[in-house]
Curated annotation (Swiss-Prot):
The gene is atpB. It is found in: Cell inner membrane. Its main location: membrane. Gene3D superfamilies: ATP synthase, F0 complex, subunit A. The keyword Transmembrane helix applies. CDD domains: ATP-synt_Fo_a_6 (cd00310). The lineage of its organism: Bacteria, Pseudomonadati, Pseudomonadota, Alphaproteobacteria, Rickettsiales. F-type ATPases have 2 components, CF(1) - the catalytic core - and CF(0) - the membrane proton channel. CF(1) has five subunits: alpha(3), beta(3), gamma(1), delta(1), epsilon(1). CF(0) has three main subunits: a(1), b(2) and c(9-12). The alpha and beta chains form an alternating ring which encloses part of the gamma chain. CF(1) is attached to CF(0) by a central stalk formed by the gamma and epsilon chains, while a peripheral stalk is formed by the delta and b chains. GO terms for cellular component: plasma membrane; proton-transporting ATP synthase complex. It is a multi-pass membrane protein. The chain crosses the membrane at residues 29-49, 84-104, 114-134, 140-160, 189-209, 210-230. It comes from Rickettsia bellii (strain OSU 85-389). This is ATP synthase subunit a.
Length: 242
């Protein structure tokens, strides 16, 4: 029997908390975000608390992730992006661990919910906007008028560029949430069919599931990378007005 593949995305209250008319209950979503944060902190603490000249495997993996983030900033923002390493690194690691937690049996994919991804996207959007105005003042608004635009075309270009800029949080959040949700739904549906096929084909369908799980892990890592590198691209607009 095929179970509803959308059940895995249900948010459930673990601790019911209400303050006046506001529901601030502790849910499975909050629990997995907290767990992902604690695990990430523990992982990098163990990786870098006692650095060695000949690094351990844990230290190597931590350095790979750190270098990946610094390379993203250097390639997209340049040397001026170094001061943003803590923010971008935290963003990438948080999304990565939340994505990977969804691959654990009976786990919960936090980033499949648009409210979570939109909150992250809004934080990026606000950071970029604040950095742009602090660094360039009102000249930051020149971002909405591409250089060399004819005067008669300027009003239309400003409207288009402004709409594109304001749409960034929506596109950034929808891309991550949609990909994570679609991948897990597909995995759930195919897994249900594989269980049925095993009645007739014994263990032959198992390699298919292993391949699909491996692909979904790749997608989880890729989506964290895409979200972060787009954040770096947007940050470049604020820092260098490109």
């Amino acid at each position: 029997m095929l179970h509803n593949p959308l059940v895995q995305f249900d948010i459930k209250k673990l601790i019911d908390i209400k303050v006046m008319d506001f529901d601030i209950s502790f849910t499975n979503s909050a629990a997995y975000m907290l767990l992902a944060s604690v695990l990430a902190l523990t992982y990098f603490y163990l990786a870098f608390s006692n650095p060695r000249l000949v690094p351990s495997r844990l230290q190597i993996s931590g350095e790979i992730i750190y270098n990946l983030v610094t390379d993203m900033l250097n390639q997209n923002v340049g040397s001026k992006g170094r001061k943003f390493v803590p923010v971008i690194f935290t963003l990438f690691v948080f999304i990565l661990f939340c994505n990977l937690f969804g691959m654990i049996p009976y786990g919960f994919t936090v980033t499949s919910h648009i409210i979570i991804t939109f909150a992250l996207a809004i934080l990026v959007f606000l950071m970029v906007t604040i950095v742009g105005f602090v660094k360039h003042g009102m000249h930051f608004l020149s971002l909405f008028l591409p250089h060399g635009t004819p005067l008669w075309l300027a009003p239309l270009m400003i409207i288009i560029e402004l709409f594109t800029y304001l749409a960034r949080p929506a596109s950034l959040s929808l891309r991550l949430a949609a990909n994570m949700m679609a991948g897990h739904i597909l995995l759930k549906v195919i897994a249900s069919f594989v269980i049925t096929l095993m009645i007739y084909l014994k263990f032959l369908p198992i390699p298919l599931m292993v391949i699909l799980i491996g692909f979904e892990i790749f997608v989880a890592i890729l989506q964290a990378y895409i979200f972060t590198i787009l954040s770096c691209v947007y940050l470049n607009d604020a820092v260098n007005l490109h």
